[in-house]
Amino acid sequence: MIDISKIREALPHRYPILLVDRVLEVSDDEIVAIKNVTINEPFFNGHFPQYPVMPGVLIMEALAQTAGVLELSKKENTGKLVFYAGMDKVKFKKQVVPGDQLVMTAKFVKRRGTIAVVEAKAEVDGKLAASGTLTFAIGN
């Protein structure tokens, strides 16, 4: 398990854009993390005030950060950054609302030099909320 202090060491993100609360499982190429979604998230002020829904793009950002924690926690990547280079085959299946716990899984499926491809998914209560293929570049 990786707690928030280690996540903050790995990622440059800070409030209000840090979207990973805790890592539950980690291996060489796969990670499972959570984001506890609360009504206090700043994006709910405008998306949407009468019916708060987590923006899909922020779910994908949370997945990208999850993959970033895995990559940047490795000793060989100390001091480096992970740059989000693209996403493909993104699907949104379930709305994420205040009170939900987003369980995020990212699995690295391809690496070539400083480029990595990740299959990622986010679930709420065991149901798929979003999924997609993310591409990253690792650099200084």
From Swiss-Prot:
A Gene Ontology cellular-component term: cytoplasm
Pfam families: FabA
Keyword Protein transport part of the UniProt annotation: no
EC number: 4.2.1.59
Highest taxon of the lineage: Bacteria
GO MF term list: (3R)-hydroxyacyl-[acyl-carrier-protein] dehydratase activity
Predominant subcellular localization, coarse grouping: cytoplasm
Keywords on record: Cytoplasm, Lipid A biosynthesis, Lipid biosynthesis, Lipid metabolism, Lyase
The keyword DNA-binding is assigned to this record: no
Active site: H47
Reaction equations catalysed: a (3R)-hydroxyacyl-[ACP] = a (2E)-enoyl-[ACP] + H2O
Cell compartments where the protein resides: Cytoplasm
GO process terms (BP): fatty acid biosynthetic process; lipid A biosynthetic process
Family indicated by similarity: Belongs to the thioester dehydratase family. FabZ subfamily.
Function, as annotated: Involved in unsaturated fatty acids biosynthesis. Catalyzes the dehydration of short chain beta-hydroxyacyl-ACPs and long chain saturated and unsaturated beta-hydroxyacyl-ACPs.
Protein name as it appears in the record: 3-hydroxyacyl-[acyl-carrier-protein] dehydratase FabZ
Lineage start: Bacteria, Bacillati, Bacillota, Bacilli, Lactobacillales
